[in-house]
Amino acid sequence: YECTVTEAYKTISSDFFYTLVDEQYYEALEKEITKRRYISKDTGKLINEKNSFFCVKIHLKYTGSQPTNMTFYTTGYSRQTDNLMYDPGLLEFIDKALANEEKDVLYLEPGKEYDLWFFYHVLGTYSNDNTYYIQGDFQNYNDHDSYNGYLIELNNLIELD
């Protein structure tokens, strides 16, 4: 597959998700948000406001020769001012996979292109001094200590709150 990040946002509000996904996913999105104990039922915001959500739009072209149900393994990383890499970001779900039981599995057809929103829960305080990435080798499950695939830098990450 080939992929590029086309948009990326940082927010503490799950209400912002509704502005990104197609209306057909609203009901499934609401169920997912309701399940998360770290999101306030009253405000829709993260209870621990030191944490954040990264909403990352990825344009993906599936270059495989056969249709597949692809499980996306991806983590968020940050390079902090000490120049060390940390893995504070966890993929919660992908917009087009919300209707599936597995929120990170998509059916892909050869030669087709997809615009997908990936929603990450990111632990720890956000800083403009850090550089943020997502794991770009979506099919390479890793133990986070030994990942050796490529990283996609989240350039122009727009901070909303």
Task: Set out the residue ranges of the language-model regions.
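Conserved functional micro-motifs across diverse proteins
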Residues: Y1-D161
